[in-house]
Amino acid sequence: METKTNQFKAEIAEMLDLVVNSLYSKKEIFLRELISNASDAIDRAKYLGLTEKELVADNPTWGIEIAVDKSAKTMMITDNGIGMDAADLEKNLGTIASSGTKAFRKALKEKGGEALPELIGQFGVGFYAAFMVADKVRVVTKKRGTSAAFMWESDMSGSCCSCARRDISG
């Protein structure tokens, strides 16, 4: 008897809707999830900066800012954490349930890291809570130690775009 192994297939837009609306009962939760992601990004930068001094050479005042434009119906959450490159965007945002924080913890443990930073994210789905209140989500990011900035955008239709590379200093 011949057997064949197949991969599961999914209707991504419907799966995202199911995940987001099943996990979170209150729309306000999206803000907590996005702030948690920003906090983890800062903690990762601080931790890596202990051994990679060039990552924190600009002596940042770590922080998260939230700006709301009611007339444009937009909210912008800004942090000065570790940032992401194109590969990170694809892996962390373009792959549902892929936790960058979980992968970071695992890599540190494999290197023998004992004093691991207190990071919040674990499951790789909190970011998608933004779709409870937004039709479109855009992430603009630059990984510390690099000059390339990237934009990732999705309307939860199942497709996303990791595009618009731009080289900037700082």
PLM regions and their residue ranges:
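GHKL (Bergerat-fold) ATPase N-terminal catalytic module, capturing the glycine-rich phosphate-binding loop
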Residues: 1-170
